[in-house]
Amino acid sequence: MSALPAVVDDLSAFVISGRVKSRLPAEPGFETSVRTPAQGVQDGVDAELLGFRRVFLAERPELKEPGVILGGIAARTSRLGVATGIVAAGSRHPMLLASLGATIHAAYGPRFTLGVGRGAPAYGHGGHQSYEALADTCTIVKRIWSGEQFEYDGPAGNLGRLGLKDIYEGDPPEIVIGCFGLPRSARTIAETPAIDGILLPAMLTPLGVSRAVAHIRQACDRAGRDPGSVRILVEVPTAPELSEEETRQIVHARAVTYLQPAVWGRSYEVLNDWDPAVLQRLREHPQFTGIDGVLADLNFHRVQLVGPSRLLPDQWMADAAAMGSVQDCVRKLQEFRDAGADEICTYGSTPGQNAKLIAAWRERAEASAAVAVG
């Protein structure tokens, strides 16, 4: 068996982004047009062989239960990190969240990262937790992992007696929260030692990331926390050397799923300086008539959103995603690193489609290191 390449510490990957099907249709189209849970497991194997740091799986209640898919990936790999990206903190009792992390660590080694968020009721992810409840959930899970037995009645609910009789004997998993990094969430991160990092969503531009990073650093300064103790991860859609049509499905159509909901769109307006009028026209597209504010993502597969996506300026997509040649993509990823991101997570495309990109990214790092030494 050939040796695995060195891990690229600042590059991870999402697997089977968005909606999936239980099996491929007779004519699946592009590689990313339709994906299955089984392909997600293989994507994880490919990610390890290519040297990605870890893979993230975004939970969906239909066919993307994270414990199943991440467990399958961990069983077929030896060092690859596996992470939820994200699960709604309110969709599971904290004991179950703690059990998920402890079990994966015990079964496959200390490779799990728990990514949690406040919730998205439209996706069936439970209620929309307050920031206080989210912070308490993270703290509760860390306390359970440490072996504590305790009572809890607070913002996260009246949970009664908590604690695991058998725990993982080693360092606990890290916890990151999925949010935009605006002042309120930045304060939650800074004031909650149990939170180790933030996962910023796809479609933020380098400008948007730099603003989120500034909010987090300022909040840490006010809270007396070392800003360096908060790892900043960002999802970046990547489409290296792919056809224009597949690129539009990966980037433009997926952007609709983030920008159509007003509650998310406003955050992009603030961080990216994007025109609210453009996003309002997107929400008023005839294809969305009658969905009454429900997420377009729940009514249409991404390939069905290419039409509405034409309302989005191409420059917005070029600013927020890595497209074109491999070197074009490398330059774009570097912009996100320069904006303050510690780790980039490729999104929308498969690890295999990013094989040349991770190789070029590794070469860039090695060349920079050689210059520094010389």
Task: Report each predicted region and the residues it spans.
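Hydrophobic faces of well-ordered beta-strands that scaffold small-molecule active sites
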Residues: 9-16, 55-57, 81-85, 112-116, ...
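Conserved, mostly hydrophobic/aromatic
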Residues: 51, 73, 104, 141, ...
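Short, acidic/polar
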Residues: 33-47, 97-100, 179-190, 250-251, ...
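Alpha-helix-loop-beta-strand connector modules within alpha/beta enzyme cores
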Residues: 64-87, 140, 144, 221-223, ...
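An alpha-helical appendage that flanks or caps ligand/catalytic pockets
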Residues: 2-7, 127-166, 207-335, 371-374
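Glycine-enriched alpha-helix->loop->beta-strand junction motifs that scaffold or abut catalytic
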Residues: 51, 76-79, 108-110, 191-199, ...
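N-terminal beta1-alpha1-beta2 module of alpha/beta enzyme domains
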Residues: 1-81, 172-173, 371-374
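Active-site mouth loops of central-metabolism enzymes
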Residues: 11-38, 85-94, 169-181, 238-241, ...
